[in-house]
Amino acid sequence: MAGAKEVKTKIKSVQNTQKITSAMEMVAASKMRRAQERMEATRPYAEKIRQVIGHLGHANPDYRHPFLVERDEVKRVGYIVVSTDRGLCGGLNVNLFKAAINDLKGWQEQGVGAQVVPIGAKGIGFFERTGVEIPAEVRDIGDRPKLEQMIGPIKVLLDAYVDGTIDRVNLVSNQFVNTMTQRPQVQRLIPVEPVREEEMLENWDYIYEPDAASLLDDVLRRYVESQVYQGVVENIACEMAARMIAMKSASDNAAEIIDDLQITYNKARQAAITQELTEIVSGAEAVSG
């Protein structure tokens, strides 16, 4: 059995770790609430711009933008994979990478090539190890990402799609279900899913300047950018929720370890006291004898 002093040192060490994990849990909870607010604030824009695409498409049905046309044969798929820059968030990234790899393998089994634009240091490190082609990347997005950080890498895939280098673009990110649940999802970005008439709510008659086709070119790019940005913001909310839960679990585990060590410490101290008493009694008997 370890000595009482050694056990006391271990207890102090675990208590210090528990203080750190508890502080990280509180910080993550605060950041999660702010990330949720940003996530909710960006959704109306993404929904509205999709409605605008529907109106523009119906206003000029003869114009078929490349982003709206599904190609007969898919030879190469591009992925935008949104991960985190930091760890300590449970299995969030692992589950995300599994979803991405499963989808990617499904295409590869059909003889389709792939390239990946990872967002987040964890994703960059993972896909560099897989050997997949990485034409662009984004790291250090922070807790308050800016669209400007992502426009360049997004443009790389959009230009590749227009050039015919790739025939489909997917977005892989985590969906925030609730504080306890974050679900990885693979979403098709391009070609853009057709907008159903019921999604447009109203059939307004617009006046277009310069014309509907030119406006559609710009709006479709903005739509893809908004979807990626929404995915990044939502992924940050998922990251903070997962980190909060992971740190709470670590704090709870630390408390259990402290309880076990405290019992061990009490036993060691009791054994030491018993030993001292035995020695005192033995010494007294020797003197009296």
Swiss-Prot record:
Membrane topology term: Peripheral membrane protein
InterPro entries for this protein: ATP_synth_F1_ATPase_gsu, ATP_synth_F1_gsu, ATP_synth_F1_gsu_CS
Domain of life of the organism encoding this protein: Bacteria
Free-text function comment from the UniProt entry: Produces ATP from ADP in the presence of a proton gradient across the membrane. The gamma chain is believed to be important in regulating ATPase activity and the flow of protons through the CF(0) complex.
Oligomeric form and interacting partners: F-type ATPases have 2 components, CF(1) - the catalytic core - and CF(0) - the membrane proton channel. CF(1) has five subunits: alpha(3), beta(3), gamma(1), delta(1), epsilon(1). CF(0) has three main subunits: a, b and c.
PANTHER family: ATP SYNTHASE GAMMA CHAIN, ATP SYNTHASE SUBUNIT GAMMA, MITOCHONDRIAL
Protein name, as recorded: ATP synthase gamma chain
Recorded name of the encoding gene: atpG
